[in-house]
From Swiss-Prot:
It comes from Escherichia coli (strain K12). The active site is a conserved redox-active cysteine residue, the peroxidatic cysteine (C(P)), which makes the nucleophilic attack on the peroxide substrate. The peroxide oxidizes the C(P)-SH to cysteine sulfenic acid (C(P)-SOH), which then reacts with another cysteine residue, the resolving cysteine (C(R)), to form a disulfide bridge. The disulfide is subsequently reduced by an appropriate electron donor to complete the catalytic cycle. In this atypical 2-Cys peroxiredoxin, C(R) is present in the same subunit to form an intramolecular disulfide. The active site is at C46. It comes from the Bacteria. GO terms for biological process: cell redox homeostasis; cellular response to oxidative stress; response to oxidative stress. This is Peroxiredoxin Bcp. It is an enzyme of class 1 (oxidoreductase). The gene is bcp. GO terms for molecular function: hydroperoxide reductase activity; thioredoxin peroxidase activity.
Length: 156
């Protein structure tokens, strides 16, 4: 696993959202976007992380940042997740983990003694020109939003 770094050009992608509509990274050209990768919708850690972003969306918008969450869940599951948690941002389905691999977040993980391939919880702030401005890879699900907002304030 080799995640992209600040300064790299973000891979262009097109993925279905929670409503089955195609969303392209190029739709956000001229804007900053936080692309956050998370392992699985409707699980405890991922729910805490998503709700933290939801509850701080006004602050993120003030900083000029849109949010896209990416997992390998099917759009139908993402739709249920968004409805259940009243999420106010777009969730994208990368079922074949191609985009995860392009960003370098797909790789070997271990949980309770088992080793498997999956998504590593990493977020990328992409600038208005499509370049990775910052990589967030050191946070807890409960403070992800704080880590992002603090970085945005320090680099305003």
């Amino acid at each position: 696993m080799n995640p992209l770094k600040a300064g790299d050009i973000a891979p262009k992608f097109s993925l279905p959202d929670q409503d089955g509509e195609q969303v392209n990274l190029t739709d956000f050209q001229g804007q900053r976007v936080l692309v956050y990768f998370y392992p699985k919708a409707m699980t405890p850690g991922c729910t805490v992380q998503a709700c933290g972003l939801r509850d701080n969306m006004d602050e993120l918008k003030k900083a000029g940042v849109d949010v896209l969450g990416i997992s390998t869940d099917k759009p139908e599951k993402l739709s249920r997740f968004a409805e259940k948690e009243l999420l106010n941002f777009t969730l994208l389905s990368d079922e074949d983990h191609q985009v995860c691999e392009q960003f370098g977040v797909w790789g070997e993980k271990s949980f309770m003694g088992k080793t498997y391939d999956g998504i590593h919880r990493i977020s990328f702030l992409i600038d208005a020109d499509g370049k990775i401005e910052h990589v967030f890879d050191d946070f807890k699900t409960s403070n992800h939003h704080d880590v992002v907002l603090n970085w945005l304030k320090e680099h305003a």
